[in-house]
Amino acid sequence: MNKEKLRALLAIPAVITVGWGFAVAGNSGRGMDWISSPFACAVLLAFCLQWVAFVPAYLGRTERYFDIVGSATYILATAMLLIRSEGLDTRSVILGLMIFIWALRLGSFLFVRIHKAGKDGRFDVIKNCFVRFLAAWTLQGLWITFTAAAAWTAIASNYKEPFGWYAAIGILIWLVGIAIEVVADRQKSQFKANPENKDKFIRVGLWSLSRHPNYFGEILLWSGVAVIAIPVLQGWQWIVLS
C-alpha cells in the first residue's frame, strides 16, 4: 500500500472521530443518543449522505455530483432540524434561511461549472482509488458539520434568547460575506470564459485585492452565522465555534 492510500485509510477513522466529537459537543456533553438528539442526527445525516452518494460516484468514476451532494446535505440536515425543533424562533428561522440561500446559490453555481468543464481536476487521480475517494467524501461530511455546527446547535437548542444586537450584527456580516462570494465567483467565471485568459490567474475586480476573495466571503458569511448563534450556546457547545 502506497503512502497516499495509507494516509487516506488512517484519515477516515480520524475524521469520523472528530465528527463524533462535534456531535457530543453540540449535545452539550450530555452523553450521546443519536436518535433523540436532533444535532447528533444532523451530524450523522451529514456523513451518511456522503457515503451513500460515494457508492454510485465510485462505480461511475465521477466527481460531478460531489459539490451538489454537499449543498443538498446542508439543506436536508438543516430542514430536518427545523422540523424537529420544539419551538421555532426568529433566530432559528433566519439561520435556516441563510443556509438554504447559500447552499442553493453555491451548489447550483458549482454544478453548472463542473458540467461545463466536464470534470473537476482535483479528483483526476483519487476518483480511481476506492480509499482515497471515500476519504474525500468522508471529509466533506466533516466539513459540512464543521461549518454548519454553530447554526445547527442554535436551531436544535431548547434554550432561546431574544433576537438582539448579536443577531443584527451577524446578519450584516453574512450579507457582506455572501455578496463578496457571489461577486468574486461571477468575476472569475467571466474571466475564465475569455479564451485569451487561458492559464492566467485572475487579477481584476475583487481578485486584485485578495488572492481568493471567494473564500474570504465564505469565511465572512459563516462568521456571521456564528455571531447569530452565540447567544444560545451553552457549556460544551462553545466547541462548535472552533
Task: State where each predicted segment sits.
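C-terminal ends of transmembrane helices
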Residues: 51-63, 108-115
